[in-house]
């Protein structure tokens, strides 16, 4: 959790700062509100990317493509759209902070294109094998499919991301045992 030492706690500013450092890699407000150093604040964004990339650790994604995917996911995170609403103080002293999120539709928007390009690649492999060329290894084929997926996502990001219907989420902030908000 994040630590806050201010006497006059502003839950709306706190949530805004946490979202900005988590998704936009904007650290200034977060540093001011939490007392974190610039390095600590930047680490929040990097840790979120680490968590995203951990999901691929057990996947057959080629190691050489991981830095490209990491950078792309960072760019995608920076495009997340949210609005922090008016805070409501709960009876137990905690705060309920409504956040309206517009989800990115990149992955669903690009799925059909990816499927089509993956099928085209499979057809190319079949054609070349039928013409007497060696069958690519599973690793080579998986590597090519991950490259295709990266290219499709990259194209989607470059052509402008689209958003789905806004959803409302409520974040709850309370003091922990040390008297810090998280």
Question: What is each stretch, according to the model?
Answer:
Residues 25-29, 104-106, 179-181:
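Primarily extracytoplasmic ectodomains and periplasmic/lumenal surface modules that are beta-strand-rich
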Residues 4-78, 83:
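Core segments of small alpha/beta cavity-forming domains
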Residues 145-160:
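Acidic, glycine-rich flexible loop segments
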Residues 30-39, 136-137, 141-146, 162-169:
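Short glycine-rich, low-complexity/disordered patches
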Residues 61-136, 140-145:
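Surface-exposed, charged secondary-structure patches
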Residues 118-134, 140, 159-182:
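Short beta-strand edge/turn micro-motifs at domain boundaries
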């Amino acid at each position: 959790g994040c630590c806050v030492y201010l006497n006059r706690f502003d839950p709306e500013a706190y949530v805004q700062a946490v979202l900005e450092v988590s998704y936009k890699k904007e650290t200034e407000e977060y540093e001011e509100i939490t007392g974190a150093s610039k390095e600590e604040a930047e680490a929040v964004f990097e840790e979120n990317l680490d968590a995203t990339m951990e999901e691929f650790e057990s996947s057959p994604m080629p190691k050489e493509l991981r830095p490209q995917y990491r950078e792309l996911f960072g760019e995608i995170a920076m495009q997340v759209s949210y609005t922090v609403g008016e805070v409501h103080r709960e009876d137990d002293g905690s705060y309920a902070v409504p956040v309206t999120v517009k989800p990115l539709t990149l992955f669903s928007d690009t799925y059909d294109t990816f499927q089509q390009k993956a099928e085209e690649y499979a057809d190319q492999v079949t054609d070349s094998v039928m013409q007497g060329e060696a069958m690519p290894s599973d690793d080579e084929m998986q590597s090519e499919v991950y490259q295709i997926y990266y290219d499709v996502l990259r194209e989607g990001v470059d052509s402008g991301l689209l958003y789905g219907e806004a959803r409302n989420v409520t974040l709850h902030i309370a003091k922990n045992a040390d008297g810090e908000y998280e």
